[in-house]
Amino acid sequence: MTKRKINVLDYSSEILKALSKGILLTVKGDEKVNSMVISWGHLGMEWNKPIFITYVRENRYTKAILDKTLDFTINIPLDKMDTKTFSICGTKSGRDIDKIKEANLTLIDSEIVSSPAVKELPITLECKVLYKQKQVLDNLPDDIVKRDYPQDVDGTAVGSNRDPHTAYYGEIVAAYIIEEWIKGCCKLIYWNESKK
């Protein structure tokens, strides 16, 4: 499997645009892999390191794995995520189903972290957690708490619920494009081709 290394900051605009539409956060623990759709996150520099910050609610299955492994991958589509993948990974729990199998995703061994890359979402950021912080709802404006953390919605509900997020600051230890997927795709798209 050919992986073309990229400078993540050269692709920041494309990564953040994809994030707003939904990308995958993938974790692996005890031989179980789970992916979830995320649309909240940050890409930048902190502690003189490239960092991706992701947010995971307290009751999510992904959080239980992430707290043990302390690494993750961010998997980004070249265009938009397949609707089946988006539906399965965005509305189902890995406690109940094998989302990788249900969404027909192909896992690729990562270069450094234990969590795998996903062939069908070929832009990959491998991240090691350097810091994590649980959000304090009392410190947020009331309108945000009401909209994003409705206290009358159980923490097991998909979407907005009463559980706060934990912010995970992941040092990006590897970043690349899985090229085999691009070559086999019916629609050859290279993001930021001039930066090769």
Q: What positions do the PLM features span?
A:
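Basic, polyanion-binding surface patches
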Residues: M1-K196
